[in-house]
Amino acid sequence: MKIYQIDSSARKEGSSSRALAKKLLNKIKKPGDEVIYRDLDDDMLFVSGLTESGMKIAEKDQTEEHKKMFELSDKLVSELKESDIIIISAPIYNYGPPATLKAWCDLAARIGETFKFKPNGRREGLLKNKQAYLVITSGGTKLNSSEDFLTPWLKFILNFFGIEKVEVISADQMALDYEKSIKEAEKQIENII
């Protein structure tokens, strides 16, 4: 099995989402499993007009600048395709995702790679038979409330890619009771089969 762990918190030290994702990885990893690790804060992901326009033209028509921009996108898509299990840790920043996580999703959304258009115009995700775990933390936002724009969006994006098995581990409203939130998230991790 290949496990793809993606951390998106801007905080390297003292990040609750990173710490919980590490606990989850230790819980589900079996001897012989391979881990692909991606720290989105290290990559400084960025989507420009060049990237966006390059996604709409055939590879043979792309400039050298387009091709260079696609090296990272190709790598992200490859990591997703290779993996059986995906762990994404993300704090809620201003009610939504970290900018690097949004850019990761934009760079991974590739026609013919992670999704395709069917003859009727509807989209179909191409990344089937994968399990995703979302480790979501927040200071004050209640998960799945009208203020949480991260969790439903990220679940939608993964479904869009074809990943239908998505489980959420949450440590929300940590500013109100940090210990309680962390313990509840740790219990959710312990209960994963």
Swiss-Prot record:
GO MF term set: electron transfer activity; FMN binding; oxidoreductase activity, acting on NAD(P)H as acceptor; oxidoreductase activity, acting on NAD(P)H, quinone or similar compound as acceptor
Keywords: Flavoprotein, FMN, NAD, Oxidoreductase
Cofactor mode of binding and number, as noted: Binds 1 FMN per subunit.
Catalytic activity entry: 2 a quinone + NADH + H(+) = 2 a 1,4-benzosemiquinone + NAD(+); N,N-dimethyl-1,4-phenylenediamine + anthranilate + 2 NAD(+) = 2-(4-dimethylaminophenyl)diazenylbenzoate + 2 NADH + 2 H(+)
Residues given in the record as FMN binding sites: 9, 15-17, 137-140
EC nos: 1.6.5.-, 1.7.1.17
Cofactor entry: FMN
Disulfide bonds: none
The keyword NAD belongs to this UniProt entry's keyword annotation: yes
Subunit structure: Homodimer.
Physiological role: Quinone reductase that provides resistance to thiol-specific stress caused by electrophilic quinones.
Family (UniProt): Belongs to the azoreductase type 1 family.
Protein name: FMN-dependent NADH:quinone oxidoreductase
Gene name of the record: azoR
